[in-house]
Amino acid sequence: MVKKRQADSRDHDCSTDSGNEDLHHRKGLGSPGQSDGATPTTASCQHIKKAVDAARLRRLLKSTGLLYECSQCQKLGKTAGSAAGAGASEGAVGPGGNPVTFEFDNTLWLCLKCGSQLCGRARHKHALEHYQTPHSDSHALAMNTRSFDIWCYECDMKICSNLRKNLLECVELVKKLAQKPPTSTVTPSTPTISYIEEKLKAALEHLTPIVPMTGGSFDDSSSRGSLAAAGGGGGVGSSRNRQVAIPMPPPEPSSGLSTSDSLTSVPGMAKRIDQYSATTNGNTGNKRLLTLETPRIENERLPRVRGLTNLGNTCFFNAVMQCLAQTPFLLSVLKELSEPGEEFILPGGTFTIKDKGDIELPMIKGTLSSWGGLTAALANALEELQAGGSVFTPRKLFDRLCVKCPQFTGGDQHDAHELLRQLLESVRNEDLKRYQRVILQNLGYKDQDVNSVSEEMRQKCKIYGNQAGDRILRPEQVFRGFLVSTLTCQDCHNVSSRHEYFLDMSLPVAVEKPQPPQRRKPSPELSLTSSSSSVTPSTGQPTINTKFTDGSVNFTASSPSFFLHAHEAASLGPSKSQVKKEKERQRKAKRAAKKRQKSSLNLNGNDSGNGNELAESVDQDDASLASLGAGDGQANDGLEQTNGQTEDSTTSSVTTSEHSDADVEDNLVEDTAAPSTNNVPSSTASLTAPSKTYMDSNGNAQPPGEKRDDTPEHMDKDSLEEDENDSGIATSPAPTATNSSTSTSATGNNNSVAGSGLSGSSGALEDPLAPASLVTAGLSEKGASVIRQVSVGAEQGASNGTEDADGEAKAIEQPEKTPSQAQAMAQAQARTKRVRTQSYSDWSTTIAPRYQCEDGECSVQSCLNNFTAVELMTGQNKVGCDSCTQRINGSDPKAKSVNTNATKQLLVSSPPAVLILHLKRFQLGPRCIFRKLTRPVSYPNLLDIAAFCGSKVKNLPNIDRKQKKLLYALYGVVEHSGGMYGGHYTAYVKVRPKVAPGDKRWKFLPHGSKAELDQDDDQLKKLEELLAKEKAREQHLKVLDDSDDFSNSSSNSSTSDESQTPATPLEEQQTQQAQQPQQPQQLEEAANVRAPPGKWYYVSDSRVQEVSEDTALKAQAYLLFYERIY
């Protein structure tokens, strides 16, 4: 027997139609919208045998079919409009506390005995009255003609259709009839004159906000009053010859009342009077009233959201369709596929085929056919939803989707994100098949047998198919974006990038990015007993295992213990020698901490007098750092007792987290600071590197992984100091030429330090006054250059001379300069030495500063920040490095790939026109139990993703080169309420005006293929030159030969060891003239961007209610739909 799962008492928000019979007598067991998983059902019902007549039902339904309206309601003259008014007058309250004004669907209940189809309790309870009417037989069972639920009035419970065979036959019969269009029982009567007059009056009242009327009111009484006033009480003849008098405008509102108060009166008449007064009053009042009235009229012209019929637990489908119906560009793009005859070209090229060598594939030109069945059904459904009206039944689209994705059949609950992905992928595959037909026809594959095709032909088909798949197909233009994955090897520092497209981004719901498990660092008092102590069962005496888990310090050769922490009840105390050594270690740790703090504050290096003393102190500090970084405080003893280990305490015990200059675009190469820093050993840079926080300009403690200003983010911005010391993995990139020359120019007393810094990549050390060190201390590159100038002047003024590594004395010019003058000189020198280079590392920088997360923040921005953070790939996640493989194994093609530690980072390389964010709320918890994360995640109305986009995004044609923001506006939210095994999907959508054909937002749609992002450096340079020429032509400026970027060099910069091309003063002057008027204009344009106006609606299947924007921003979001507006 299979053990039944106990229903969760919290999971009640399942999806059924809004007209269910279980609205009555729920006895506290759930809400009216429960489904099979949570609605109380009975295992057996004794009324099934007497209350079901399948044969009679089949005969009746064959002639009448399923009805659309209740026959009793039609006889009594109760229409759907009166029902909706009655429902609204009952005082139902929806989200946000607003009264519910939704549309009732026409769900009917079919009596399984006589076949009558009547309305349920949600409307006029005719089905219940039919049961309560005395009959000679039982009429206790009724079936919902939309959701196919069966209800027993006698048991007051929901009945499972699988209990009896006759019940199952009835359900199958009704399901077949439900695919046909419903019929009406009563033919509409001939329209009367009064009915026509009421329709005309309603239409004219609806048009009054658009066309101001000058003939008075449509009310008969008001018309007669106007005639009497005009005729002075005259008779009929006078009323015929005289026109209707125009009513006097109302008095202007007092100064205490706002204009919005005067405009929010009775709909129709009040607006007509306001518009009339706007045309008769002064010019100032005209402009003000018309300006305020225009957006209100535009919003009122927007169609109301159309509800969707629940086809049986299809709330997941309905919620997604409501958001897709409000998606811009989608319907227009899909309609372009309806007409056949579109031409395309596949480039072909030279490719290597197995056992055939290199072959040349010709270019293919072809003509595409029209769209497929699923694409046509989707376009039809979207058009119906955008047109507005009553409840729409998307049966055709859902059936088409179920044919391609059978998992959605059966009426079970499914995931809304899964449905969205399957729907978009199915539409994409249909479009791709149009290309595949042309490819097969060109290769002569159409008339051949599949099994008889050669391997060469299969390879050709695959190559052409991949070229077609790399194209941005028509349905993907709306949602498709690109992510770039950048891998940096920690051994050879080789950087590689790979682009991959996405239709939506799945973000984990977490405050911080999950890091590898770290060992808890014990306090110094417990470090002596940090080895696991246990009591042997035989002797009862405690035994001590002094093997530590840091990987380098082994006190004894005993087996490693499972426990990493000491027991508090350890009875064995430390010896005197151990206490003495512990005190000595504490003193060394305090001295090292003081020296680190002192060296980080004294950036000008005035206290570096004697090289021998400094090297000695550095050795001691490194040893103390190693003792602290080992994790257990026992490093010194380990250094004395390790067998067969020789290590240099200066180089290999400490891993620096220096920042390289290779990951920026326009780097400032400063040569003036080098002479003044030669007498400062480069190993002192490691003292300032492992700081966990820094103080920004506002005095806030920030982690070193986040950016402070407009400078680009560094590759190792996570800076896992604890993991570095534990694993011995260096996170610093390879030293550049500047760092190497600084290390070799150190004094003779520190030759061993400089040599060790050059020998190993993990021990690469840099100058404390180098740009990366100053940036690590919390300064921007501009501020770092100013401090370098000031420190150089101060040091030179104190010593009156500095000796180079070669012993040459250099003359010193020491004019007094203010910080502003020093900054201006640094900028002038930077402009003359700016050079544009291209490298993979440009993808590791962002076009805007990194987002600063607050403590405990859980928002979409924090989720994106964690998604784009640098990951350390180590242990089981090591990455195969081609450079290391070639260096170690040579050019042997059969050599095994060498796996190394690496860092990985994901950034957006091409932003989509419509961004879909999926919050991963359903996760696998402890003990392999699925759970739902109900933690609130805040999301803004305007989202800026510039902090998560790579700097090469500026090369795209739909992004301005000086753009610092990429703004998206929210227009759709899919919310899930309930638990893991039972819930309900609803949607919040914003109805907005359609995008005009000439709107600039059309350029946000991508064109081309993925290969455009994977161009070689030469192709990229050519592309940049073309872009630079185009912009220079618009600005009437000359073209710079090196195709330099006109943006500020403090944002994204990079260094290069290649020859540098200095810019002429004339070019610099032209660049400044081009920058000055445009930079404020660009910022002002970004600040004035607003979300498109519109109305927010809450939609739950067929239930539609207008809500405020604040209500939509407080939902428990599962899917977020954003449209790009800037």
From Swiss-Prot:
Residues 1-15, 705-718, 807-816 have a biased composition (Basic and acidic residues). Disruption phenotype: RNAi-mediated knockdown in third instar larvae results in a significant reduction in survival in response to UV radiation. Zn(2+) 1 binds at residues 45, 47, 152, 155. One of its GO terms (molecular function) is cysteine-type deubiquitinase activity. The keyword Phosphoprotein applies. Zn(2+) 3 binds at residues 111, 114, 130, 139. It comes from the Eukaryota. InterPro entries: Papain-like_cys_pep_sf, Peptidase_C19, Peptidase_C19_UCH, USP_CS, USP_dom, Znf_RING/FYVE/PHD, Znf_UBP. The keyword Zinc applies. Gene3D superfamilies: Cysteine proteinases, Zinc/RING finger domain, C3HC4 (zinc finger). Zn(2+) 2 binds at residues 70, 73, 119, 126. Residues 32-44, 674-701 have a biased composition (Polar residues). Its EC number is 3.4.19.12. GO terms for biological process: protein deubiquitination; proteolysis; regulation of protein stability. Keywords: Hydrolase, Metal-binding, Phosphoprotein, Protease, Zinc, Zinc-finger. A zinc finger (UBP-type) spans 43-181. GO terms for cellular component: cytosol; nucleus. Residues 586-598 have a biased composition (Basic residues). It catalyses: Thiol-dependent hydrolysis of ester, thioester, amide, peptide and isopeptide bonds formed by the C-terminal Gly of ubiquitin (a 76-residue protein attached to proteins as an intracellular targeting signal). Involved in the regulation of DNA damage repair. Belongs to the peptidase C19 family. This is Ubiquitin carboxyl-terminal hydrolase 16/45. It comes from Drosophila melanogaster (Fruit fly). The gene is Usp16-45.
